[in-house]
Amino acid sequence: MPRTRTLANAPIMILNGPNLNLLGQRQPEIYGSDTLADVEALCAKAAAAHGGTVDFRQSNHEGELVDWIHEARLHHVGIVINPAAYSHTSVAILDALNTCDGLPVVEVHISNIHQREEFRHHSYVSLRADGVIAGCGVQGYAFAVERVAALAETGRADA
């Protein structure tokens, strides 16, 4: 059955993992001074440029993120996810994302995870993501929204 969700009738789910509620306060030398509210405004502006909206959420709890992914597969046009530390540990989040057949998923990281500690170099989420954006600061979220919008509009990976 073809997907009937479009940017005009379904939001992009933006999911933020643990400790991102402290964005702007925690390690500003790595993550910058922008707050999560600033990131939400940036994402909303990027989606609006494509006639879309965002459903922006943050949780420090893996199970809640999994529940939201399950919700997104039914009611959203795509997912932008910053799984934060769960990138490197959560098979549960990967498994949830793998249930989202045909739904564009873009992983975003504020810092370049490949320039950080060795344990941060691997991401389980990347195994499902249609794209990964890292090291672009909070602007990476806007890039991720742009990519999800392009994939949602065309349904093509080369969009």
Curated annotation (Swiss-Prot):
Q: Report whether Lyase shows up as a keyword of the record.
A: yes
Annotated residues for binding of substrate: 82, 88, 95, 110-111, 120
Q: Where is this site: Transition state stabilizer?
A: 26
Give the disulfide map.
none
EC no.?
A: 4.2.1.10
Q: Which InterPro entries match?
A: DHquinase_II, DHquinase_II_CS, DHquinase_II_sf
Q: In which pathway does it act?
A: Metabolic intermediate biosynthesis; chorismate biosynthesis; chorismate from D-erythrose 4-phosphate and phosphoenolpyruvate: step 3/7
Provide a Gene Ontology MF annotation, just one: 3-dehydroquinate dehydratase activity
Look at the named UniProt entry and state the broad enzyme category this protein falls under. Answer: lyase
GO BP field: amino acid biosynthetic process; aromatic amino acid family biosynthetic process; chorismate biosynthetic process; quinate catabolic process
UniProt-annotated catalytic positions: 31, 109
Q: Which domain of life is it from?
A: Bacteria
Q: Which Gene3D superfamilies match?
A: Dehydroquinase, class II
What keywords sit in the KW lines? Amino-acid biosynthesis, Aromatic amino acid biosynthesis, Lyase
Reaction equation(s) it catalyzes: 3-dehydroquinate = 3-dehydroshikimate + H2O
From the UniProt annotation, give the residues forming the signal peptide.
Answer: none
PROSITE patterns listed in its UniProt record: DEHYDROQUINASE_II (PS01029)
Annotated function: Catalyzes a trans-dehydration via an enolate intermediate.
Q: Which family does it belong to?
A: Belongs to the type-II 3-dehydroquinase family.
Report quaternary structure and partners: Homododecamer.
Q: Which PANTHER family match?
A: CATABOLIC 3-DEHYDROQUINASE
Q: What is this protein called?
A: 3-dehydroquinate dehydratase
Q: Which organism is it from?
A: Streptomyces avermitilis (strain ATCC 31267 / DSM 46492 / JCM 5070 / NBRC 14893 / NCIMB 12804 / NRRL 8165 / MA-4680)
Tell me what gene encodes this: aroQ
